[in-house]
């Protein structure tokens, strides 16, 4: 699926992740940059609980990096909750560098009082 974007959300592509004929998760890649993308990141993924621990998120991320390159993006911001060890290990395996760990400001469109600090990474894309 493709979403055109609005004032808060960047345009994005949304894909189902399959192993054979079995859907095991979802991944999205957001195109461009705005204030919110620093905290929301350019890639979002979710792997069904019974399929976690198999590097499927990593492999799906590697595939959608090609979409970013097609859109002439040179770097991506990748984020996750500070406590999400599996996610930040995936991000680090992709070669992203940690910029900071920070609680998003109240101006962030998805802000909640109880939200965790976010690990914010930068991934430079090779041409």
Report residues per predicted region.
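Acyl-donor (CoA/ACP) binding surface of acyl/acetyltransferases
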Residues: 3, 9-127
């Amino acid at each position: 699926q493709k979403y055109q974007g609005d004032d808060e959300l960047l345009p994005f592509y949304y894909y189902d992740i399959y192993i054979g004929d079995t859907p095991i998760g979802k991944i999205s890649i957001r195109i461009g940059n705005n204030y919110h993308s620093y905290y929301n990141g350019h890639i979002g993924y979710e792997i069904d609980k019974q399929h976690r621990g198999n590097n499927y998120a990593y492999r799906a991320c590697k595939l959608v990096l090609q979409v970013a390159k097609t859109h002439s993006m040179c770097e991506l911001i990748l984020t996750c909750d500070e406590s999400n060890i599996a996610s930040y290990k995936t991000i680090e395996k992709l070669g992203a560098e940690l910029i900071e760990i920070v609680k998003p400001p109240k101006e962030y469109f998805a802000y909640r009082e109880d939200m965790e600090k976010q690990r914010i990474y930068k991934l430079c894309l090779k041409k």
